[in-house]
């Protein structure tokens, strides 16, 4: 995805990060950096180089809460996409409401991501999304 954006007009305004997310967020907080929007696609599970364990079910609320401190005075949106069965869209909605929504108000939407199965009119669940946006 980053190669596509680098060729587009927005290439100079978007940063793609592959890093330990919580460590990155803490560094950005210390530096005083602010963001108008955050788009995240955190993994369901991961291990750090020193054996640290990341589990979306356990760590997502902390990550979103800390990221809220990175938002500018008038943020535009906060989007989370996750391919997991361990967190429901209702839980994601509640996390956004208790963090970003509590600080900035705005509108929150959350739901399931799915792939349509056309031959029997079903949807294969693939994950969840949650979006906070300024009203």
Model-predicted regions and their roles:
Residues 1-5:
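Short, small-residue-biased leader/transition segments that mark boundaries at the very start
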Residues 9-14, 104-106:
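A short helix-to-beta-strand connector/capping loop
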Residues 11, 18, 35-66:
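Mobile active-site "lid"/loop adjacent to the S-adenosyl-L-methionine
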Residues 15-17, 111:
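General small-molecule cofactor/ligand-binding pocket signal
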Residues 18-24:
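Conserved SAM/SAH-binding loop
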Residues 26-37:
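A short acidic, Gly/Pro-enriched loop at the edge of an enzyme's catalytic core
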Residues 71-73:
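Helix-to-beta-strand junctions that scaffold the AdoMet/dcAdoMet cofactor pocket
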Residues 75-135:
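C-terminal catalytic and target-recognition region of SAM-dependent MTase-like enzymes
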């Amino acid at each position: 995805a980053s190669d596509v954006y680098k060729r587009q007009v927005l290439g100079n305004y978007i940063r793609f990060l592959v890093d330990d997310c919580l460590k990155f967020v803490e560094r950005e907080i210390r530096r005083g950096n602010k963001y108008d929007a955050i788009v995240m696609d955190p993994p369901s599970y991961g291990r750090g180089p020193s054996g640290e364990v990341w589990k979306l079910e356990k760590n997502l609320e902390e990550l979103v809460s800390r990221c809220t401190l990175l938002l500018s005075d008038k943020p535009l949106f906060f989007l989370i996409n996750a391919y997991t069965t361990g967190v429901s869209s209702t839980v994601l909605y509640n996390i956004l409401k208790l963090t970003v929504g509590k600080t900035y108000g705005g509108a929150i939407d959350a739901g399931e991501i799915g792939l349509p199965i056309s031959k029997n009119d079903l949807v294969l669940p693939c994950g969840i999304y949650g979006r906070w946006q300024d009203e």
